[in-house]
Amino acid sequence: PCDLSISGDIYPAADGKMVFAANNKVYLLSADGTCQLLSTLKIGEQLMGEGLTLRSNTLYKDGQKVADGLRGCQAVQELSQGKYVALCDEQTKTNSHVAVLTEGTRTLAIAPDYRFCVSGQENTHHLISTIMDKKGNMLYSEPFYYLHDLTNGTLATAGNMAFDTNGNLYVSTPLGVQVADHNGRVRAILSLPAGAVHSLAFSGNYLYVRCGEKIFVRQMKAIGHNPKHGAMSYQSQG
């Protein structure tokens, strides 16, 4: 059985499943509730995604070192072809495999076409949008997505975010999962009886959400986009 005393975020995995860490162990969870123990984390090691861990400012993929010198990293997204984007305070060692974003806090999502990324911003209604060029440079960061908030502008994004293949952004917040369109406007809020959503993972057409030590799953018509499966175009919403 799964240990649901989860530390950190939940993350998408292959075949519509998700992974998470609890008490230094990494679990794989299916939509039908089947749970499998995958591995044990080392002391000081943090799960950052499927097969991704961070320890002593060093990023690992399936136990192999990817890059070091990543100080204050809060989120990592794996792209295709061995590339990564990391939200960190700074990068002290240049690495061609990892593009570092220093604007924003806590959470990171990559647009399906790889043209921009979105990061969290504390004590505001907004999320930050940053253009990514083909060389991995981060350009022109600015507040863009506007979230609903009942705390008078003191919202800190509760957990992580994900795009679907239509380019809509799903954000875990105290009000529930807020779904924003291409123009940065929230078009829907998926609320849960358990209250605030602390984290989410969009894997295939299954949307997983964590509320404290409870995990809910909903089968969606939309399909989550996992950045490591490659860039894809999507139709403009105007």
Question: Over which residues does each language-model region extend?
Answer:
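Short loop/turn segments immediately following beta-strands, especially the blade-tip
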Residues: 130-137, 219-227
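Beta-rich, blade/repeat-based domains predominating
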Residues: 3-21, 42-57, 68-89, 97-117, ...
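Short loop/turn segments immediately following the C-termini of beta-strands
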Residues: 21-23, 56-57, 88-90, 121-122, ...
